[in-house]
Amino acid sequence: MTKEILLIDDDADELEVFTEALRSVDKNIQCSHAKDLNEALDFLNHNSPAYIFIDYNMPTMNGLDCVSEIKKMEKLENTKIILYSNYISEEMSQKAISLGAYKCVKKPSMINVLIKNLKEILNH
């Protein structure tokens, strides 16, 4: 069964690494990309992915704002939203969860750690 995932990140290199890691976890994953909230909302108006991964640090709107906007879409009530960043404070994590995020994760510097984290998230 194909799992559809949306990655929201303005960094093309990060998207490439994340996509490769996801595909190493599960070959049946279909990844779509958006560089900002506007692109994401355009995509989400026509699609309902199983998971949405959002980078916290983006130029026009931070990840918490993205979580808040996406959670307003009723059709995505079962979609799991994961916020990720190089640094996740306890306060940021609590705020994201209160806004409806499924989980907050720190971006690991090593691909094998990223793959391990993704396996845990996707196999829940």
How would you label these PLM feature ranges?
Residues D42, L64-E77:
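Short amphipathic alpha-helix used as the core "switch/output" element in two-component signaling
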Residues N47-F53:
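Active-site beta3 strand of CheY-like receiver
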